């Protein structure tokens, strides 16, 4: 009898995914009270969409009819070197082409391969674009544990990964979760300049990533002097994590930074033309030029 789980993992590796794990597409019973508490505390800030589709976030069968399995995939984005020509900082995941495009293309190829090799298989691909609790599914699939900074941490390569899923109506052999290896470490909690992190929970409304990307209003004055020059996203809680000493540079060409971005220093004079040149098809497009200029102006104020 064919081992479809093993074959799918092999095909995922051929497409460049670093890790692939499988879990049964069941209701996430343990997560329901946690998600409800997080929302009730308004930790989602002004990300109103986080409160939508509560039932779908917890049950993949409401996203895909007849769902039997969740295939979780990790793709490394850790760069060879940080962009440090300028004092302003951009999260490492945004150095290259927008991950949505890159991973979606790979997932489509994987799904096509599954349908070609196995037959009539229904399902959907997800790349941070629907109400899917990707870190929880990756944890259930044994790809890592959710750390105190709420990121998925993999023992072999840390946490600088994109997470994606295929939810299929195909029954597959599920992998089991691994244990938590954070131990007594509080490096991420201690390092967060806005005090957004408590053990295993992040107050999104205080997170620098939220403030520089998701928040469309003015950044509250209480965060002045606390942004540490981050103008798009933030990597502090990952940079200080001991497990990221195992991070290795990725080999995905699309994630290599724009050559002009490596040396760019004139952030205070950035124009729409320069913005388009530096960030075409980049995740930074999400914040738009005005958002980036707002962030730059805010971090300059002390």
UniProtKB/Swiss-Prot annotation:
Taxonomy of the source species: Bacteria, Pseudomonadati, Bacteroidota, Cytophagia, Cytophagales
Q: What does the entry's cofactor note say about binding and number?
A: Binds 2 [4Fe-4S] clusters per monomer.
Which residues of this UniProt protein bind [4Fe-4S] cluster 2?
A: 192, 207, 234, 237
Q: Which UniProt keywords apply?
A: 4Fe-4S, Cytoplasm, Iron, Iron-sulfur, Metal-binding, Oxidoreductase, Queuosine biosynthesis, Repeat, tRNA processing
- Please state where this protein is localized: Cytoplasm
What is this protein called in UniProt? Epoxyqueuosine reductase
- Report one GO cellular component: cytoplasm
| Family assignment from sequence similarity | Belongs to the QueG family.
Looking up Pfam families in the UniProt record yields:
Fer4_16 (PF13484), QueG_DUF1730 (PF08331)
The coding gene here is: queG
What does the record give as the function of this protein? Answer: Catalyzes the conversion of epoxyqueuosine (oQ) to queuosine (Q), which is a hypermodified base found in the wobble positions of tRNA(Asp), tRNA(Asn), tRNA(His) and tRNA(Tyr).
Which positions are annotated as binding [4Fe-4S] cluster 1?
A: 182, 185, 188, 241
Give cofactor(s), names only.
cob(II)alamin; [4Fe-4S] cluster
Write down the HAMAP family for this protein, in alphabetical order: QueG
């Amino acid at each position: 009898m064919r081992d479809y789980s093993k074959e799918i993992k092999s095909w995922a590796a051929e497409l460049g995914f670093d890790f692939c794990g499988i879990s049964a597409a069941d209701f996430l019973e343990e997560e329901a009270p946690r998600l409800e508490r997080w929302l009730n505390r308004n930790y989602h800030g002004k990300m109103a969409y986080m409160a939508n589709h509560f039932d779908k976030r917890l049950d993949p069968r409401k996203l895909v009819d007849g769902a039997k399995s969740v295939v979780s995939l990790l793709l490394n984005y850790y760069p060879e070197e940080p962009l440090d020509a300028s004092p302003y900082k951009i999260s490492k995941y945004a150095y290259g082409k927008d991950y949505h495009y890159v991973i979606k293309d790979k997932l489509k190829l994987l799904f096509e391969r599954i349908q070609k090799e196995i037959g009539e298989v229904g399902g959907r691909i997800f790349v941070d674009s629907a109400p899917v609790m990707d870190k929880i599914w990756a944890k259930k699939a044994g790809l890592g544990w959710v750390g105190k900074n709420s990121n998925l941490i993999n023992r072999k390569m840390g946490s600088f990964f994109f997470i994606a899923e295929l939810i299929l109506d195909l029954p597959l052999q599920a992998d089991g979760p691994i244990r938590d290896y954070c131990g007594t470490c509080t490096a991420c909690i201690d390092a967060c300049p806005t005090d957004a992190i408590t053990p295993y929970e992040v107050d999104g409304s205080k997170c620098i990533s939220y403030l520089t990307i998701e928040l469309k209003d003015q950044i509250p004055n209480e965060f002045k002097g606390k942004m540490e020059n981050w103008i798009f996203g933030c990597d502090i809680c990952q940079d200080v994590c001991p497990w990221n000493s195992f991070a290795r540079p990725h080999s995905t060409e699309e994630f290599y930074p724009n050559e002009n971005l490596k040396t760019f220093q004139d952030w205070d004079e950035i124009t729409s033309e320069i913005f388009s040149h530096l960030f075409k098809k980049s995740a930074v497009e999400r914040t738009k030029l005005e958002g980036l200029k707002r962030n730059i102006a805010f971090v300059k104020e002390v």
